Amino acid sequence: NIEIFQKIKKKIFPFYKNKDLKFVFKKLQEDSSNQSIPAKFVGGCVRKYLSNEDIDDIDIATSLTTDKIKEKIKEKKFKVIESGIKHGTVTLVKNKLKLELTTLRRDIKTDGRHAEIEFTDNWLEDSKRRDLTINAIYLDINGKIYDYHDGARDLKTNVVKFIGDPNTRIQEDYLRIIRFLRFAIQYDS
């Protein structure tokens, strides 16, 4: 869609001028085939971008493991915070830039708050474990949107809904009901 691409180019590409962010994407892309894009923006930064809101946090989903991420970015002297290493999450900090990178994963078992996970390289599988359609929209470094659950449409029409069965989503993590209510109020759904 040309209109969406023009919006992305206008709003996000100036954001890509950050040399450290470009470095991270370049390093994560190394050794991958042209068919495979190993890192994409996801969650709040994509949702806020599509809603023309200020982006205050940057989440990146990746098919790479945390060890591989740390190895690839070591030359740039990021502060690496192992914020959720057992769940595949590292936070990279440099100057005012803070990036949270999480390995693609799927839930194996949940207890209402914490999940036992398994890493995957499947973007659709990763998207299915997210809470809301508007938080499961991916955006690659080239501005292409990957939207497996019609989250962009829901965002445009101010619809806040769970991915799949709401009861299942809430049983997996009880905090999701609070997030749902927060977004329903925010987007006046």
Identify the residue ranges that each predicted region occupies.
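Catalytic cores of the polymerase beta-like nucleotidyltransferase superfamily
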Residues: 1-189
